[in-house]
A protein has these predicted regions:
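Conserved substrate/cofactor phosphate-moiety recognition/catalytic segment
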Residues: 22-64
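ATP-binding Walker
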Residues: 11
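A glycine- and Lys/Arg-enriched "phosphate-lid" helix/loop adjacent to the NTP-binding pocket
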Residues: 94-144
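Glycine-rich phosphate-binding loop used to anchor ATP phosphates in small-molecule kinases
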Residues: 56-96, 100-101
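Hydrophobic anchor at the beta1->P-loop junction of P-loop NTPases
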Residues: 5
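Walker A/P-loop
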Residues: 14
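P-loop (Walker A) phosphate-binding loop of NTP-binding proteins
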Residues: 8
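NTP-dependent small-molecule kinase module
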Residues: 19, 96, 143-179
């Protein structure tokens, strides 16, 4: 079984995905990390190369290659604007695609930053000084990606849960222990 977690940045795909994989005994993959390994460049460099369509196609190719193997896995999917290359995959019997959602305010609380070397750091002073901007951008992302992810069969509202609570709720809601 391949569990694909979709959602906006900072919604909790990676942390929840790692826990979900651990609880189920699955392998965890992060599409951002897979892109870095595939191309040998940082994400900062990657997002500065070529048009978004080409970058999303590469991400979709990586998703295809990961789901091709029969091993059970959880895959945290980078926000994708162009998902047409994986639409047939989403209806595959060995794929469960789930959009993780939460409010802009809850996502803002989890907001972290990364430097040019992809080192993640937290800067709450900066974050809160620019709260209006970030909340607005998060809301725009929720609306944009929400419109794209309407084709996904499964949607899950995190509702401010912790990653542990979210992983357990996903297992219960989607009967993942039985899959």
């Amino acid at each position: 079984m391949n569990i694909l977690l979709f959602g906006v940045s900072n919604v909790g795909k990676n942390v929840t995905g790692k826990l979900l994989a651990e609880y189920l005994g699955y392998t965890f993959f992060d599409i951002d990390q897979a892109v870095k390994e595939e191309l040998g460049i940082t994400l900062e460099e990657f997002v500065s190369t070529g048009p978004l369509l080409e970058r999303d196609r590469l991400r979709c190719d990586i998703i295809h290659s990961l789901t091709y193997s029969k091993a059970n896995k959880v895959i945290a999917v980078t926000p994708l604007s162009y998902i047409q290359d994986i639409i047939p995959l989403l209806s595959s019997p060995n794929v469960m695609a789930i959009e993780l959602k939460d409010s802009a305010g809850n996502i803002f609380k989890r907001l972290v930053f990364s430097d040019e070397n992809d080192v993640i750091y937290q800067d709450d002073d900066y974050k809160y000084a620019h709260a209006d901007y970030y909340l607005s951008e998060i809301q725009k992302d929720l609306e944009w990606y929400g419109s794209i992810y309407t084709i996904l069969e499964h949607h899950f509202d995190i509702s401010g849960r912790t990653p542990e609570e979210t992983a357990n709720a996903l297992i219960e809601t989607f009967h993942l222990k039985e899959v």
